[in-house]
Amino acid sequence: MESTLSAFSTVKATAMARSSGGPSLPLLTISKALNRHFTGARHLHPLLLARCSPSVRRLGGFHGSRFTSSNSALRSLGAAVLPVIRHRLECLSSSSPSFRSISSGGGSGFGGYNGGSGGGGGGGSESGDSKSKLGANASDGVSVPSSDIIILDVGGMTCGGCSASVKKILESQPQVASASVNLTTETAIVWPVPEAKSVPDWQKSLGETLANHLTNCGFQSTPRDLVTENFFKVFETKTKDKQARLKESGRELAVSWALCAVCLVGHLTHFLGVNAPWIHAIHSTGFHVSLCLITLLGPGRKLVLDGIKSLLKGSPNMNTLVGLGALSSFSVSSLAAMIPKLGWKTFFEEPVMLIAFVLLGRNLEQRAKIKATSDMTGLLSVLPSKARLLLDGDLQNSTVEVPCNSLSVGDLVVILPGDRVPADGVVKSGRSTIDESSFTGEPLPVTKESGSQVAAGSINLNGTLTVEVHRSGGETAVGDIIRLVEEAQSREAPVQQLVDKVAGRFTYGVMALSAATFTFWNLFGAHVLPSALHNGSPMSLALQLSCSVLVVACPCALGLATPTAMLVGTSLGARRGLLLRGGDILEKFSLVDTVVFDKTGTLTKGHPVVTEVIIPENPRHNLNDTWSEVEVLMLAAAVESNTTHPVGKAIVKAARARNCQTMKAEDGTFTEEPGSGAVAIVNNKRVTVGTLEWVKRHGATGNSLLALEEHEINNQSVVYIGVDNTLAAVIRFEDKVREDAAQVVENLTRQGIDVYMLSGDKRNAANYVASVVGINHERVIAGVKPAEKKNFINELQKNKKIVAMVGDGINDAAALASSNVGVAMGGGAGAASEVSPVVLMGNRLTQLLDAMELSRQTMKTVKQNLWWAFGYNIVGIPIAAGVLLPLTGTMLTPSMAGALMGVSSLGVMTNSLLLRYRFFSNRNDKNVKPEPKEGTKQPHENTRWKQSS
């Protein structure tokens, strides 16, 4: 650790780049006006809509490159507004409800004052924190999510060899940089090369090209429509398709087992010595041939044909092995029946029983796959189908039930007790408690009142709420989570790369072993073990054993070992408020040995409260004017109203509590620097808010500045206020430590994980929090800026540490991105969630323990699956080849081998499903007291002023 700290001290002076401010006030005003105007025009006359269409086409040319003006501000305004107008008109002309609020969302991030954690930014509005509250990656603009990838729904994959072939086919295309294929979810995600994105409408054209190519190669594929309105329909369609395939599989299974039962009846009557005329018909060769043909041409037809087609196209799969085994048994038996003098045995019953056992295994496997996706289906089911739309503002007489997918931005919906919230939005009137457990995993209900954010799918428990819609349908936070989790499930864990290499060559290896088995027993077996022939010929025994080798091999178990465990793990996490973006993240997270916490908003609650405004004792000596507390708050709030930083929010709340006059920063003057502060022109005065260094940089002077540092005690941080070239005041804050922070740190330490804390605060404030939560002061790094946090993470990594960084604000974004695993608190800034592969949607530190335990249990399950899959094939193939025949006289018939093959796949699926129970039995936070969530009743901190709700 000492080497890390010493190395870090050499880079601590790194300068941090100045970030630009948010959009100017006029641009936001125009955006809001457009939003109100067009969302209010949903019921325009069709003639007017038709007349809008030519306008849409004409607006197509008004992009930034073609809208020219000598005025740079006008060019910027045109480039920003005209695409929005075009999008709105397109929505109207197609009667589409896909409006999005463009006026919400935080800005570019605001620095941590005197070491605050940072976050927020310019350009936010009264709903600026909606992104962070309603989920990671909740978009506030008109962009389409997942804009850099192509998702394909791929059918016809039956084993690991199939998924490896699909990946190889995709990556062989020049437009594809890399691809990832998930056998369990039957999807492929493609990352194209940069050159492919230069083509207009490249996603649609390239997606169709790749899908057609896969279809021609034997894998029926369709490109996924990435438009959010269609996402839920796609997900529902896939679920219905799986259910339909399961029903079809059930019918085929019933027919095959009926035929198998007839075969077994014949054997049973022969064994019992039953002698009746109809028994002779059942034992006749012609009857057995008929049963075998009906099986191969009926329930086994698809299986056999798919296997032969795959073999001819150079990508053999498990169906190829089963098909070859069944056809070989039928061919040899037919030859033996037609030429009795060969002395070969006939075993027409083997293909019948083989197909029956294989179809049984497939049916159980399909059921297990549907069960594995039940968590995702459960997430989808939390969204209601109907909503009560409020018309004319009359709650009593003007509500009408409408489909939820028809809701638009700006609509008002009424939510009665017991109803599920139909869309993401903001409460306009009413007060109630909301159950968000299906969304965040938070067991405690949360109080909601006017101005509170609500998420689609949460349950209204008592009062009536009127909510303004901000996002609906696939644009909701639940939709984002489902979409991100599905993409995460298609991201391969590094361990999967070994499996892909084996699975891609596995089928060829099995066919080679089958040929070797036939050669050995046909040429040498009779000499080595003549008693094994049982009055048959060497050729008959060799053919039977070689067929058993083909059938017993199970590439499907290899292909399912990793993706099924990842599917269950990520889906299980999503249902419990843990967003884990990929199998590679689960694997890394399971190996973490160092956890670095940000202080503000992570170890503390992130809701600082103004406790005191301090004016210098001799203001006339340092200032041109004397400033009152009200004036200081009024000026500081004018600057902070442009941010969503917790400190900024606290200042604005304090100003409102004192009924300060509302002032605004002059347009285009707001500037900020994460980790330092912000400055703007207010009422012709340059107002600086931030750290002491920041205020000095902007010209504030006076010896009393240093004396004011003494006011920063314990966990109370300060922000300096400068007006022009003078110090106006210092504002003190208090931010309480999370109730579960100490227990989480203790738990991590007990597991042998090194725990550090990074903070932009001064040493005494950071040490106070460290003392409360139990972090050694030697592992507290205070007074650091965002770039320095990133450098510290890099130093730990140079010392071979696997680092997880836990943070919540834009100040943490660089450190989160550079760590091995970035963990964002769900209530933090959107940028933190966007760069973090792990998001704790419930905004509770105990979820960190859940996420780590889930990753460990998932990887443990993956390893168990791989041991089983490899072990089964390593043991099963030699037994099928007759290795026990000289020792014990034991051999596997093709039908017995088929039954074992089904059991192997089912074992992998069952073990993956058991992950649910293992996770709950090993959770580390059973004794951790749940932390009261924001909005629940709890004692208020003692402050100088009572804060308004």
UniProtKB/Swiss-Prot annotation:
What does this protein do, in the record's words?
Mediates copper transfer across the plastid envelope. Required for the delivery of copper into the plastid stroma, which is essential for the function of copper proteins. Seems to be selective for monovalent copper Cu(+) transport. Also plays a role in glucose signaling-mediated cell proliferation of root meristem in non-green tissues.
Chain spans, region Disordered: 113-142, 925-949
Q: From the Swiss-Prot or TrEMBL record, give the protein name.
A: Copper-transporting ATPase PAA1, chloroplastic
Q: Which InterPro entries match?
A: ATPase_P-typ_cyto_dom_N, ATPase_P-typ_P_site, ATPase_P-typ_TM_dom_sf, ATPase_P-typ_transduc_dom_A_sf, HAD-like_sf, HAD_sf, Heavy-metal-associated_CS, HMA_dom
Q: Which Enzyme Commission numbers does its entry carry?
A: 7.2.2.8
Species for this entry: Arabidopsis thaliana
Q: Which residues bind Cu(+)?
A: 159, 162
> Where, per UniProt, does this protein localize?
Plastid, Chloroplast membrane
Task: State which tissues express it.
Answer: Expressed in the shoots and roots.
Question: What GO biological process term is on the record, naming one?
Answer: photosynthetic electron transport chain
Gene this chain is encoded by:
PAA1
Q: Where does ATP bind?
A: 807-814
A GO cellular component entry from the record: chloroplast
Q: Which NCBIfam families match?
A: ATPase-IB1_Cu, ATPase-IB_hvy, ATPase_P-type
The record lists Mg(2+) as bound by 808, 812
Spell out the reaction equation it catalyses.
Cu(+)(in) + ATP + H2O = Cu(+)(out) + ADP + phosphate + H(+)
Q: What GO terms are given for molecular function? A: ATP binding; ATP hydrolysis activity; copper chaperone activity; copper ion transmembrane transporter activity; metal ion binding; P-type monovalent copper transporter activity
Listed A to Z, the keywords are: ATP-binding, Chloroplast, Copper, Copper transport, Ion transport, Magnesium, Membrane, Metal-binding, Nucleotide-binding, Plastid, Transit peptide, Translocase, Transmembrane, Transmembrane helix, Transport
Task: Say yes or no: keyword Protease present.
Answer: no
> TM spans, by residue?
253-274, 287-306, 314-334, 349-369, 502-524, 543-560, 863-882, 895-913
Q: Keyword Manganese: yes or no?
A: no
